[in-house]
């Protein structure tokens, strides 16, 4: 019992001491309220960046707009980042490929070159087609009849030639996109690049996602009548995942500083390993088609079917043989069969000669043949009847 009494006495002594200590500490506190405001509590509990991440853009705009009520200066919201492009975007706008010289007589020209195997770039005038090797320089001449206004630009863009592929954007294949063959200025997915120019701009349209390269227009140098721009094509026409053997067109446009069209011209392009060979082959096929199927006059219908066919030329008929042969046949049935076959062949020859205008001579020939066949028939019958009668 003495131990319990001692413990109770200790508690009774400690309680007043603890109360006095707490009251003394409470008096030492400042009179102002140290509790933070509701806005400060929100900042302590959740940072603004994390709050925007969880609440979304609408909530983030609402939270950021709260302190703006106290500030008389209104803050404009920042620009919204565009959505990333799909790997193979489709364009809703197809550029025109029709030639338009405009007020400045804008048109293209190319250097004359042959079809040797060693040539790296060659142009075919009848096909209006450029044959070149991968990543080889192709000079293109810009001709004008009058000087364009200051600040004019030249744009080059590639599109697919066939109507079923026109809406698709022309770009390099995945293999060549990963190749480190650029100078860092051109994006890896761009097909056309410019060589020998200090101010090329590689652009991608935000709406159509089409690639183009733009350079400032420079007037011809002294003693020259045209301006030359050197282009390169960074993917083969046969690459899978890229052009995939689909023909393409390169559209060259002359624009002013505001982007208004001043002139347009285009040409077909084939990027291959042997440009001279491919040009020679395609020109030969083009000439054969012109001989077999000539072009329709301008006033005729566009969808009219060609009258010519690609059938082989008719074979020349051999002249009839004028010699006669005698054939001895044993048995009447066999003789009648050969006789009918011979008459059918003679009748066929008679029709053939009538078409060539020699029907009279052949009709007399047919009569003589029939007379000889009947006389031979009588002779053979006499020979057969002779032994039987004996």
From Swiss-Prot:
One Gene Ontology molecular-function label: RNA polymerase II transcription regulatory region sequence-specific DNA binding
Modified residues (Phosphoserine): 12, 18, 23, 37, 180, 266, 312, 389
Modified residues (Phosphothreonine): 21, 281
Region Interaction with E4F1, annotated ranges: 256-294
Compositionally skewed regions (Basic residues) per UniProt: 367-382
Modified sites of kind N6,N6-dimethyllysine: 367, 370, 379
Residue ranges, annotated region (Disordered): 348-390
Any one GO biological process: embryo development ending in birth or egg hatching
Motif [KR]-[STA]-K motif per UniProt: ranges: 367-369
Identification of the protein by name: Cellular tumor antigen p53
Species the sequence originates in: Mus musculus (Mouse)
């Amino acid at each position: 019992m003495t131990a319990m009494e001692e413990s109770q006495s200790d508690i009774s002594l400690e309680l007043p001491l603890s109360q006095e200590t707490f009251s003394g500490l409470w008096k030492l506190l400042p009179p102002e309220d140290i509790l933070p405001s509701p806005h400060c509590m929100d900042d302590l509990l959740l940072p603004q960046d994390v709050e925007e991440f969880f609440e979304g853009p609408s909530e983030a705009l609402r939270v950021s707009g709260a302190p703006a009520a106290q500030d008389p200066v209104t803050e404009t919201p920042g620009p919204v980042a565009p959505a990333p492009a799909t790997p193979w975007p489709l364009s809703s706008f197809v550029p025109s490929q029709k030639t338009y010289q405009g007020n400045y007589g804008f048109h293209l020209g190319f250097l004359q070159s042959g079809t040797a195997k060693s040539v790296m770039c060659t142009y075919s005038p009848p096909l209006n087609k450029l044959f070149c090797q991968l990543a080889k320089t192709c000079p293109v001449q810009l001709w004008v009849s009058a000087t364009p206004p200051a600040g004019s630009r030249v744009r080059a863009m590639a599109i697919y030639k066939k109507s079923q592929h026109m809406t698709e954007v022309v770009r390099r294949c995945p293999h060549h996109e990963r190749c480190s063959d650029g100078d860092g200025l051109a994006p890896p997915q761009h097909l056309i690049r410019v060589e020998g120019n200090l101010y090329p701009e590689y652009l991608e349209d935000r709406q159509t996602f089409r690639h183009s390269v733009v350079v400032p227009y420079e007037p011809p140098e002294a003693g020259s009548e045209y301006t030359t721009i050197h282009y390169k094509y960074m993917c083969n026409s046969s690459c899978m995942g890229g052009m995939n053997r689909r023909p393409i067109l390169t559209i060259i446009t002359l624009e002013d500083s505001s982007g208004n069209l001043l002139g347009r011209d285009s040409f077909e392009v084939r990027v291959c390993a042997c440009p001279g060979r491919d040009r020679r082959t395609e020109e030969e096929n083009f000439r054969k088609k012109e001989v077999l199927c000539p072009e329709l006059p301008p006033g005729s219908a566009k969808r009219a079917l060609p009258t010519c066919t690609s059938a082989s030329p008719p074979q020349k008929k051999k002249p009839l043989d004028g010699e006669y042969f005698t054939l001895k046949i044993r048995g009447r049935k066999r003789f009648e069969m050969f006789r009918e076959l011979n008459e059918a062949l003679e009748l066929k020859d008679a029709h053939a000669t009538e078409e060539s205008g020699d029907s009279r001579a052949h009709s007399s020939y047919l009569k003589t043949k029939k007379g000889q066949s009947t006389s031979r028939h009588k002779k053979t019958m006499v020979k057969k009847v002779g032994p039987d009668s004996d």
